[in-house]
Amino acid sequence: MAEFIMVVGTSSNSGKTTITAGLCRILANKGYKVAPFKSQNMSLNSRVAKEDGEIAIAQYTQSLACRVEPSVHFNPILLKPKGNFISQVIVHGRPYKDMNYNEYRKNKDFFLKKIKESLEILDREYDYVIMEGAGSCCEINLLKDDIANLRIAELVNAKAILVADIDRGGVFASIYGTIKLLPENWRKLIKGIIINKFRGNVEVLKEGIEKIEELTGIPVLGIVPYDENLVLPEEDSQVLQSMRSFGNAKSGVEINVVRFSKISNFTDLDPLRYDAFIKFIDFDDDITGDILIFPGTRSSTKEAYYLKQHNFDEKVLEFLKDGGIVIGICGGYQVLGKELIDKEKKESDVGDIEGLKIFDAKTYFGNDKVVKNSCGFLEIDNKTFNVKGYEIHEGFTYSKEKPLIKIERGFGNCGNGFDGSIKKFGDGLAIGTYFHGIFENYEFRNYIINLIRKRKGLDEIYGDSYKDSIEKSLNYFAEVVERSVNLKPLGI
């Protein structure tokens, strides 16, 4: 039988995900078998669990904090927005239906049943389950249909913590309002409050904390400091709307990333942040970097349409002829082909469309979706790299180019034992692959970065800076939480 703890928030982006990860790592460090859990998540950033099903990137990262293999039961319901208020609903890792909010709401009992099934499995297999809520736990206009917050805590009699973000202001009002608006049976579940993202001297909060404890009858368990150095994968593509660049501006290597309107799995870029400067470019921008990446997208045909409208194919070809390196991942790989065939308009309302014609390849869209943890041997310049990744794609690609990866496990282009395409343009190089997470393979990542560094007379890089940073961040934040928060009321 597991102990259940739930982290809920006064708002979105209050820090629930990182607090949950911190608690997971604290308990894992104590030798417990721990599982993360989020009943319902909405994200275009997903990973593949051990059952070859999709879960949100946040629950994947939290599984790293727990030091356990990710499972579809960590995130039984995943909503992947498709546009026009429609989401693809993923249940236990597999596509269920495309639904709007009203359809989803009417099927609440079915989804609740699936959530309960996952909770029963986790209850049997783990010592602790650290649950994360979604958004605000008290959207009073949505409470009767909310299956992501305290209704789920009540099912398992979880001890709940309320997290409030002081950085955005109004923290005490948001705490008081949230608690007072909750139904009494859910209010009783909250055992403590965490004030998150604080900058400055904690003494200035003393009077406010005393007052909020008096008004609510719930103790403030701790104040967690704001820390810009904490680097964990983002799950929300909204962060990209205002982001122009990130990474190491002193690295000597610049990577341009095409800013797709429906970008997905942009965490593919995270491993590059330590060894390159990453700059997003729009369709009408010039290519200024050493490497150009076409990331994943929820709508390859629509992105191909916009790229062609801006004559981006001409820019890419010129860039390759000048010695540039172009890399397409998943949907980004599809748009680099000759044609995208979508006769029934399954992928978008665009239908069939020409790609950028970098590769002699055609992609066909149908009803099937590939979700696989994959591995194989990547060959480039007479070098072979043993690589791992994960595939989440609709569309099968038939390429006449040299394949990039000989598959040992997975699906790849079209189930023929190969993945991707590779093509040289003089000193230029074009690479396409369905392997998300390709840059997590540090030997391949370093090889690509070092191609540019050698051209510029810079020293080569070695080692796995990304993996080291994730572990360092998880351990560091666990220490911060343990130091800042009184965990005894939670039984930790």
UniProtKB/Swiss-Prot annotation:
The active site is at C330, H436. GO terms for biological process: cobalamin biosynthetic process. The keyword Lipoprotein does not apply. PROSITE patterns: GATASE_COBBQ. Keywords: Cobalamin biosynthesis, Glutamine amidotransferase. It comes from the Archaea. Catalyzes amidations at positions B, D, E, and G on adenosylcobyrinic A,C-diamide. NH(2) groups are provided by glutamine, and one molecule of ATP is hydrogenolyzed for each amidation. This is Probable cobyric acid synthase. It comes from Methanocaldococcus jannaschii (strain ATCC 43067 / DSM 2661 / JAL-1 / JCM 10045 / NBRC 100440) (Methanococcus jannaschii). The gene is cobQ.
